[in-house]
From Swiss-Prot:
SUPFAM superfamilies documented for this protein: eIF4e-like
UniProt xrefs under InterPro entries: TIF_eIF4e-like, TIF_eIF_4E, TIF_eIF_4E_CS
Polar residues biased stretches: 17-26
GO biological process entries: regulation of translation; response to virus
Function of the protein: Component of the protein complex eIF4F, which is involved in the recognition of the mRNA cap, ATP-dependent unwinding of 5'-terminal secondary structure and recruitment of mRNA to the ribosome. Recognizes and binds the 7-methylguanosine-containing mRNA cap during an early step in the initiation of protein synthesis and facilitates ribosome binding by inducing the unwinding of the mRNAs secondary structures.
Protein name per the record: Eukaryotic translation initiation factor 4E-2
Pfam families named among the record's database cross-references: IF4E (PF01652)
Compartment(s): Nucleus; Cytoplasm
Gene3D superfamilies: RNA Cap, Translation Initiation Factor Eif4e
Species name: Arabidopsis thaliana
Free-text description of this protein's post-translational modifications in UniProt: According to the redox status, the Cys-138-Cys-176 disulfide bridge may have a role in regulating protein function by affecting its ability to bind capped mRNA.
């Protein structure tokens, strides 16, 4: 399991969330025990005014900040892969989130990639889309891929996620999700898209992704169908 037992990070403050308010348990807190409730002490009655008639505590209900789309984290690890009969059968859906608050609560309680076992994969896909070639929405698509040194992997993964959930791509409707592959031979992040034949959309996504991350090397787009039939011999359809 990739969820670690640590409190929610102070990054929540950057999203205009006050950690000193009392909130009811969120769905995340109910399903992921490692995530702590974001709450503080209720305001004590003033000592100067002894109003015994009213001792009601005040609860501030936070307003959620919704994303345009809901997203789901998926995970796959080497031990599961070694025993699987059908590719992708070991994929596990972790949690679906739809708000800024849920995203940071989940992200801040997932082990960083550098603590994973080599061969692990973490996915963040739009809800209702499974990170498999066989998924109807992914079937005719492909992926852009970037390679990173381990020292910058986590920051580039986070920036990719923020670009996705924050709808920073002009062709965002064309994107299925992102994948982080933790490998001994080279860590990589990929963006999966829906329609490989839509050259204009694919080139736009590839160029914007490079600009957002400040990535200087050439990246290539490989069609899923080519990858299925040719494996590592699959050629790049587009490059930017």
């Amino acid at each position: 399991m990739v969820v670690m037992d640590s409190p929610v990070s102070g990054r929540m403050a950057d999203q205009n969330i006050d950690p000193n308010t009392t909130t009811s348990p969120s769905p995340i807190e109910k399903h992921v025990s490692a995530i702590k409730a974001i709450s503080g002490d209720e305001k004590a009655p003033s000592k100067e005014k002894k109003n015994y008639a009213s001792k009601k505590s005040t609860t501030v209900i936070q307003k959620s900040h919704c994303f345009q789309n809901s997203w789901t984290f998926w995970f796959d690890n080497p031990s599961s892969k070694s025993n699987q009969v059908i590719w992708g059968s070991s994929l596990r859906s972790l949690y679906t989130f739809a708000t800024i608050e849920e995203f940071w609560s989940l992200y801040n309680n997932i082990h960083p990639p550098t603590k994973w076992v080599s061969g692990s994969d973490l996915y963040c896909f739009k809800d209702k889309i499974e990170p498999k070639w066989e998924d109807p929405i992914c079937a005719n698509g492909g992926k852009w891929t970037m390679f990173f040194p381990r020292a910058t992997l986590e920051s580039n993964w986070l920036n990719t996620l923020l670009a996705l959930v924050g709808e920073q791509f002009d062709q965002g409707d064309e994107i299925c999700g992102a994948v982080l592959n933790f490998r001994t031979r080279g860590d990589r992040i990929s963006l999966w898209t829906k329609k490989a034949a839509n050259e204009e959309a694919q080139l736009s996504i590839g160029k914007q992704w490079k600009e957002l991350l400040g990535y200087n090397d050439t990246i290539g787009f490989i069609v899923h169908e080519d990858a299925k039939t040719l494996d590592r011999d699959a050629k790049r359809r587009y490059t930017v």
